[in-house]
Swiss-Prot record:
Protein known as: Glycerol-3-phosphate cytidylyltransferase
Thermal dependence of activity, per record: Optimum temperature is 50 degrees Celsius.
Binding site for CTP: 9-10, 14-17, 46, 113-120
Effect of T119A: 8% of wild-type activity
UniProt-annotated binding residues for substrate: K44, K77
Record-linked Pfam families: CTP_transf_like
pH dependence: Optimum pH is 6.5-9.5.
Something else known: Proceeds via a random order reaction mechanism where there is negative cooperativity in the binding of substrates but not in catalysis.
Induction: Positively regulated by WalR. Mainly expressed during exponential growth and rapidly shut off as cells enter the stationary phase.
Family of the protein in this entry: Belongs to the cytidylyltransferase family.
Lineage: Bacteria, Bacillati, Bacillota, Bacilli, Bacillales
């Protein structure tokens, strides 16, 4: 079985997230999604609208997602690859090159972002109403 992993906050889930998850799943048989915990978001000074538990619940209902795990810190990725027997590490191309150090453990793929949609854009548009 070919296993794929991706990481993100996945707050205010939108069709760009769904397209990323769909394309990530197409790279293997089993997709693990690591989502930032509330504590990790605080460390990153990133505010999420939904709590970790609510984001996890939402992601677990998506047909492309086989497993959801917590992302607690930047450093855990190497261990996650080992612990979950990962073959492919996937991120959006806004992270291009940042995870190349993982190439000795698995294939690293940067997928193009979906044009015209982002959580930041949604938040800005809602704030402008």
């Amino acid at each position: 079985m070919k296993k794929v992993i991706t990481y993100g906050t996945f707050d205010l889930l939108h069709w760009g997230h769904i397209k990323l998850l769909e394309r990530a799943k197409q790279l293997g048989d089993y997709l693990v999604v690591a989502i930032s915990t509330d504590e990790f978001n605080l460390q990153k000074q990133k505010k999420a609208y939904h709590s970790y538990e609510h984001r996890k619940l939402i992601l677990e209902t998506i047909r492309y997602v086989d497993e959801v795990i917590p992302e607690k810190n930047w450093e855990q990725k190497k261990q996650d690859i080992i612990d979950h027997n990962i073959d492919v590490f996937v991120m959006g191309d806004d992270w291009e090159g940042k995870f190349d150090f993982l190439k000795d453990q698995c294939e690293v793929v940067y997928l193009p972002r979906t044009e015209g949609i982002s959580t930041t854009k949604i938040k800005e548009e809602i704030a402008g109403l």
